[in-house]
Amino acid sequence: MHAEAVAGIVDRVVTRYRRDPTCMLQILREVQEACDWIPPEAVDRMQATLGVPRTKIEGVAGFYSFLYTQPRGKYRILFSDNITDRMAGNLALMERLCSNLWIEPGKVSEDGLVSVDKTSCTGMCDQGPALLVNNYAVTRLSAERIDEIAELVRNKVPVAEWPADYFKVEDNIRKPDIMLASQMSPGDALRAARERVPSDGLMASNMRSWREGLPSGLGGPAAMLDEIKRANLRGRGGAGFTTGLKWEACRNAPLKPGQQRFVVCNADEGEPGTFKDRVLLTSYADLVFEGMTVAAYAIGARRGFLYLRGEYRHLLEPLNAVLERRRQDKLLGTDIIGIPGGDFDIEIHLGAGAYVCGEESALIESLEGKRGTPRNRPPFPVTNGYLDQPTIVNNVETFAAAALIALKGGEWYAAIGTKLSAGTKILSVSGDCERPGLYEYPFGVSIQQVLDDCGAKDTQAVQVSGPSGVCVSPDEFDRVIGFEDIPTAGAFTIFDNSRDMFEVARNYVHFFQHESCGFCTPCRVGTSLLKNLMDKLHNGCGSPYDFTEIEKLNQLLQSMSHCGLGHTACNPVLDTIAKFRPAYEKHMVQQDFAPAFDLDRALASARQMTGRDDAAAHIIKEEFGEENSL
């Protein structure tokens, strides 16, 4: 593409985003969609039109795995490499596609037509193996479908003209409860919230913007906050912070002149094995957007963002259509449902393949057009969030729950679940079971009950809440899902007795190493060292000494890492060592220490090049008797 054409593309995109540097990620993403990559000419033009240094633009582009500063194929194919995809044979399918297309994994074909590589979990664990082609998901891969895809690529058929069945993504709702069975019509929760305002409060609200709030003791936003606190709603993204307290802290945060409050929905569902938010945004988008609007009413916000993970690119247009319908129905925009000053709107920002952006401060950095590096805390987002202004960040499921609370009340919600864990939890069930999909339960459900419901047999282990969570063995299946026992962001991955739990942990370790943002040395280096140790064990060179090294790494990562990724990176290894040690011991040699690689094997290529195979061309391994052992 000529430089003039690239400049024209950049100018159109930058103009659409009002020449706003905080939209850097969105601008880069759209330029890449038009150019297939981000050429140097595009960076030059962005520097000139945005007034942003080239180094900063390149730094942002280089941070996100879905942005390319080197040419990629016209067809960019990424195989999902979550453990469930591995179990379903994704590597063999990738090898088959590469063979059909005469291409090496991780490379671009000589004609520039196609590139094939792996990526982290794409949120299709219940219908894998899966891949992304030009950011669109293809599910239920088989050898036959791979052959068909290869033929389509060779014939240069545009992705938009591929069979629609390839891109079918199902909800797979297996067990609904109050949220997944909800029949709430758009606007019901907002009208219910308005009706809770006492008559004196309603009179006051008619004279005030919801941004100003109401006098002490009156209803409106304060009443809505009370309902959320009465419900004992806690965050559904994994941390479990009390939602009402977070909203109240943001509401009470002082504003400087020209500042405002923001509502952010974290839809960067990157934890391997989790896909509940995908379904909520596909079939319950009104519930989520209504919850965001309820939050805006409660804290006095005028502007909201949905941060949608790049792997869910296929949801962007449908979600924007829902937002536009809500604007037409006066459920977004100005004077929402007739509330004077009830001005609130939502825009969608698309991520670009960075797991760390699931952390709320890293997500805010990304929203501001920067690298997704977690911030130092305090200060917290409720006082210094987006653009250093008060911001609440909640999970998709949390906002959906808030809408139900606004509709039916806090006492109704608090009566569901357990004393410390109110409401329900949606579990993303995948792996070795007959019926993978979404299961919604009141908090307090046992692991065994979920296994029975999904048709799991001969279960060896369950990984709850993804790699950063906990691995549960059969003698623990009576434990329950809840903040008082096993909290979870939603992943529930099942492994039967045919699975090697060492390889499961190794897959998770590779994931953490790949997704480390690189900001802090302990995590950047520590996850690489952990990966190397697991690979050493995989190659049959492990020893008891390596377990000691893993413990040391865990202590370092726990105490020195900047964010939760480093803190939890050793979890899958330590859990499986403790509960499935034989899976590790079969990879070990019977000595205190073993080198990480075979020196003699490393010389094989040199022997082949020189044509030598005599004794002097080999490393002689000395055998020590017991009396000479080191």
Question: What is each model feature region?
Answer:
Residues 1-630:
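Feature of Fe-S/electron-transfer and energy-metabolism proteins
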